[in-house]
Amino acid sequence: MKFTSLSIASLFLVLINSAFSQKENNTHCSKRDKQTTQLKSASLTVSQIAQTEKYDVNFYLLDLNMTNISTYLSGKGSFKATALQAIDSALYELFPTLTITTIKVNGVNVGYNRVGSAIKVPVNVAAGANFTIETTYNGTPPTAITNPLGGGGLTYDTSPSWGNHVVWSLSEPFSAYEWFPCKQSLTDKADSCQVKLTVPDTCKAGSNGLLENIVSLGNGTSRYEWKHRHPIDYYLISVAVAKYVDYTIYANPIGAPAPIMIKNYIYNNPATLPNFQADINETADFIELFYGMFGPYPFEDEKYGHCMAPISGGMEHQTMTTQGFFNKTLTAHELAHQWWGNHVTCASWSDIWINEGFASYCEYLMLENLYPVEKNQFMLDVHDNVMTQNGGSVWVLDSLNENRIFSGRLTYDKGSGIIHTMRYMMNNDSLFFATLKNYQSSFSNSTAHGVDFRDVAQTTSGVNFNPYFEQWYFGEGFPTYSVRWKQVGNDAIIRITHTASKPNVTPTFTNPISLKIARQGLQDTTIRFDISANSNDFLISNLGLIGNNIIVDPANWVINDFGSVAQDNTLSLQESIAEANISVVPNPNNGIFSLNGLNETGILQLYNMNGQLLKEMSVEPNQLIDIKGTPKGTYLISITLSKGNKTLRLITI
């Protein structure tokens, strides 16, 4: 979900960038791994939530009468469920001001107990038994004024740009119960849903899945019958009613079994579609791009699409996003949610990064591939926004605070930025995109925590991301880097230091960092440095004479601020590093060489002059190292020993 301006009624924190963002304490990671912050409805007590966990929802059916000029609704909401243990009652939610006419359990009228939003009905079934609860109800859902805990689950408004009257739903995170009876638990996805909407003949009604039928009722109304046959979380079930026109296009991804339908319900205003048509058409390009990056579009047997509503952004309702307007980053963001948030959903609101951090990073991926001239400024803006304040973690401690859950700075921008850095740490796009696909397949149609993505990334790439997650996902702040250097003949001593913006929480950041070094009479070179402390010294052999410029993180991979860069002729290496008097023998060579002076087992990393890691291996004293098959040229090798790190130049001929 993304919003561009603050609506007092919505409680969503948003950013000032066009179409940018939606509607903090540290504990030890071992206590957070796989921790389930309560899967909360903001309106239920802990004991009431526990009662809802005694059954599993399989199917939702909504059969509602609605218009486009009022949020008043009437009809039936039912769900089928399976008892997870023997139960004598079932508890679910519906907003207390909505009037209940009858409740049926397995087709039989029953009495019920209603306390606030909690409705408790007798069920009396054994473990594994199925049951159906049908609630007939009517009324006007609350606004933010009448429900301070939420509001806006169902909204009526008029488009200020186009004049169209619209009623639409927006249930994330806790507002589904404001307009239909449900169980608000992230980890209990229904297997499918059906939404039947009876609306005036002048309107269309959009929802999830396929439009199976439009039934004219002969009284000035028609019933739109939608069916979605995939697992779906409660907050992704949607309705939108307005005077729409249907503009349907198709995407044709490589490898897809058939074209993918993109059904767009656009305001029935002669100027609206012409204004947005080119932008809407790009949706097909984005589906084709993401299909290759993440795996098949999860709902390719049904559709993707949009329903317009007067919101300042979008909401990723499953298979049919509700969107206020169309531009490339907003449309890409909401589409990306079909993978990141819908196909795989955060298992708790504390892990909203699974949804919003990844959808935000998909904006960058779209620009990188389709509008590459815009990608650098986009990521720079993301980093700059994160650094407008010193603290804050991506992981959400207060999972009932909607402003914090949907923080544009932390959930969206920092969440996006730390994925970008993980890609840099892997230093291999094949592994990075394999990680994304492996994660999608591992948690298909299910839910996951942030640490689940960490584990998939580690397994796929071989990179240890445990310290990184402690510092960047659970931790707070960002580093400010400074560089000092000293020329020693043709070699250079480089000292990289960093301070932390929130040192009482995260004092040190141990992700690698790259420096682009200008050299006199030679091509600039980019060297990647492994950071282990707030101050690290490196000896770069045969670097050449340093020129007038050293740039920290030239490609913008890491959220960081700039301190200073200066020549410092007082620098001297720590003795332990200076003692590592190691050289490449012979040099130049034909791709086979040894490390003279190496007296312990170490780790060798081979980089090209652009700073790209080509090989990593363990090396022993007196070992012949074979890199034949690498193109002839100049390389840098980094040797990590118990006493420090040394970088040498290597030439193959």
Show which residues each predicted segment covers:
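Bacterial Sec-dependent N-terminal signal peptides
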Residues: 1-29, 573, 612, 647, ...
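Acidic/His-enriched low-complexity segments
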Residues: 22-285, 289-294, 443, 490, ...
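Acidic/His/Gly-enriched intrinsically disordered linker/tail segments
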Residues: 356-421, 425, 443-444
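Juxtacatalytic substrate-recognition/specificity segment
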Residues: 195, 246-351, 403-405, 550
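C-terminal outer-membrane/trafficking sorting elements
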Residues: 574-653
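Amphipathic alpha-helical substructures
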Residues: 408-494
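Edge beta-strands of extracellular beta-sandwich domains
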Residues: 558-570, 645-652
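Beta-strand-rich binding/interaction modules
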Residues: 99-104, 485-551, 602-606
